[in-house]
UniProtKB/Swiss-Prot annotation:
Positions of modified residues (Phosphoserine): S94, S95
InterPro entries xref list: Nop12_RRM1 (IPR034777), Nucleotide-bd_a/b_plait_sf (IPR012677), RBD_domain_sf (IPR035979), RRM2_Nop12p-like (IPR047189), RRM_dom (IPR000504)
Region (Disordered): 1-28, 60-94, 108-146, 346-366, 390-438
CDD domains: RRM1_Nop12p_like (cd12669), RRM2_Nop12p_like (cd12670)
Domain of life: Eukaryota
Keyword Transferase: no
Provenance organism: Schizosaccharomyces pombe (strain 972 / ATCC 24843) (Fission yeast)
Family according to the record: Belongs to the RRM RBM34 family.
Name of the encoding gene: nop12
Protein name per UniProt: Nucleolar protein 12
GO function terms (MF aspect): RNA binding
Length: 438
């Protein structure tokens, strides 16, 4: 084998030498072939023959290594598995604890309710004792007395406050927004006494929003420039003396001042009804238009409570009846604003009766209608009369269905007939007795 390899090497070198000696050989190829070397032959390893003992020893060693690897794997698995088990146990324990806690809470609530019920029963039994019942009755009576006192005190306070309060109508709306005008109003009424508070009412707003919001945002109606006010004085005497301002001028307006506790009564003889007014009408033009007829007590335009706009009519009360007669002459005449007024005497409306007619309410009318259907008009007429009671015999001159009036002549004739009959019966008895004696 060594000889063959050496011969091959010699042949290669000789071939390369020939190629290099020739002038036509490419230098790159020459370099490649010069650098290339023959592939070395692989060296054969020595084979070792194993005996049975060696095989057994190797198997034992392999088994031990496998056992060690298995033990190490089992240890790792043991180290890993308990963690997952612990997690599962924790989860299971938490869920079990939730249910257990829930049932424990339910049991605790039931026990508390039982304890309360038992305590309530004991308290009820104790309360049933006459001493405690008397105490409870005293407490309830005291509470009732306190509540009655509180109600009475509230009523008394309200009455006192109403005695100190004055209603003012036809005030300019700028009194609410302008501080200077508000001060002028307080000065105008402070001449009669100290003023505690002023409350403004009948404010007309331009938007349909809550009244407090509209008041703070000052969204007042542009076509309504009058407001009402309640002025509370510190003394009732000052409130009574402030009534003298009724009909006086304040900021080019006629004021209507009236007491809250004792308002001015409405006299229909001195009052007129004015119709065909605009919904935006104000009191001041009416004061000026009807002022020529006579001195006026008040001008009241009836307004809608929600919008505070007029309903189209008003009432004007004069101080005497002469003003009413002069105001009636203005019927169907135009105001300076251009609307024709409808003027008439005010009428006192009587409250409507509860029953709709003389026949009674609906229940009685339905019963009467059923009776008419059943027994007719004649039977209904008989029902209204006094009927004879069952079980009593009718006397002479009485009708079993209805009592009739007996004439005096009939009574006299009946008495004469009875007397004659009695006399004839007496004569017969005497004759019969005489015959027996004979």
């Amino acid at each position: 084998m060594g000889e063959t390899n050496s011969s091959l090497d010699n042949e290669n070198t000789s071939f390369v030498g020939k190629l290099s000696s020739s002038s036509n050989v490419d230098p790159t190829l020459n370099l490649l072939f010069s650098q290339s070397k023959p592939i070395p032959k692989p060296v054969a390893k020595e084979t070792t023959v194993l005996t049975k003992k060696d095989v057994e020893v190797e198997e034992a060693n392999g088994v031990e290594e496998a056992a060690e690897t298995i033990e190490s794997d089992t240890k790792e698995v043991q180290n890993i598995k308990p963690k997952s088990k612990k997690k599962k146990k924790k989860l299971n324990d938490s869920s079990d604890d939730i249910e257990g806690k829930y049932f424990e809470e339910l049991l605790a609530e039931e026990d508390e309710e039982k304890d309360k019920d038992s305590a309530g029963l004991i308290n009820d039994e104790e309360d049933k004792s006459p001493a405690k019942q008397s105490v409870l009755e005293e407490r309830t009576s005291q509470e009732d007395v306190k509540s009655e006192r509180e109600v009475a005190e509230k009523l008394a306070n309200e009455l006192e406050k109403s005695d100190k309060t004055v209603f003012v109508n036809n005030l300019p709306a700028r009194v609410v927004t302008n501080k200077g005008d508000y001060k002028d109003l307080t000065k105008h009424f402070r001449q009669f006494g100290a003023v505690d508070s002023i409350r403004f009412r009948s404010l007309a707003f331009s938007e349909a929003i809550p009244r407090k919001v509209a008041f703070f945002e000052k969204k007042f109606h542009s076509e309504r420039d009058t407001v009402n006010a309640y002025i509370v004085f510190r003394d009732s005497s000052s409130a009574r003396s402030a009534l003298s301002l009724n009909g006086t001028m304040f900021m080019d307006r006629h004021l209507r001042v009236d007491s809250v506790s004792h308002p001015m009564p409405q006299d229909t003889k001195r009052c007129v009804f004015v119709g065909n007014l605009a919904f935006e009408a104000e009191e001041e033009p009416l004061w000026r238009y009807f002022g020529d007829c006579g001195s006026i007590d008040y001008v009241r335009i009836v307004r809608d409570p929600k919008t505070n706009l007029g309903k189209g009519f008003a009432y004007i009360q004069f101080k005497d009846t002469m003003g009413v007669d002069k105001a009636l002459l203005l019927n169907e005449k135009k105001m300076p604003e251009g609307r024709t007024l409808r003027i008439m005497r005010a009428k006192s409306t009587k409250p409507k009766s509860i029953t709709r007619s003389k026949r009674g309410d609906e229940k009685t009318r339905t019963l009467q209608g059923r009776a008419r259907k059943l027994i007719g008009k004649a039977g209904n007429a008989l029902l209204q009369q006094e009927l004879a009671l069952e079980g009593h015999r009718a006397k002479p001159g009485e009708n079993p269905l209805a009592k009739k009036k007996v004439n005096k002549k009939r009574k006299e004739r009946a008495a004469q007939w009875r007397n004659k009959k009695a006399e004839s019966v007496g004569k017969k008895q005497k004759t019969a007795a005489g015959k027996k004696d004979k």
